[in-house]
């Protein structure tokens, strides 16, 4: 499965406008992951945005347009979700999700290497 290159460009452009971020792109999760300061922040998977966010905000995030739980092998991953294209069409919604992920990235633990 490929990924939406226009969405990847949109994320790349947005992140480039934020100072003091170390950004690395990696092919992961059958898409393109944006690592911020050494930690997974967001991913483009197919046409969807995959978000990593503070699990305590799940109820708020789940109310947003385009929200889909991230389920792998029958398990719901708390603090991760997919957002369909309709949920990030407007810039205000796109920025909400990217900023949500960036905020969590500040306190998220890096995975073991």
Walk through the language-model features, giving the residues of each.
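Charge-dense, helix-prone N-terminal extensions
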Residues: 1-113
């Amino acid at each position: 499965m490929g990924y939406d290159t226009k969405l990847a460009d949109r994320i790349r452009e947005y992140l480039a406008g934020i100072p003091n971020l170390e950004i690395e792109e990696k092919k992961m999760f059958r898409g393109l992951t944006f690592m911020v300061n050494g930690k997974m922040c967001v991913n483009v998977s197919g046409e969807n945005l995959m978000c990593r966010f503070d699990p305590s905000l799940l109820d708020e995030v789940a109310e947003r347009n385009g929200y889909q739980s991230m389920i792998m092998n029958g398990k719901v991953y708390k603090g991760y979700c997919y957002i369909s294209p309709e949920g990030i069409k407007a810039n205000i919604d796109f920025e909400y999700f990217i900023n949500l992920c960036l905020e969590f990235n500040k306190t998220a633990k890096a995975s073991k290497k």
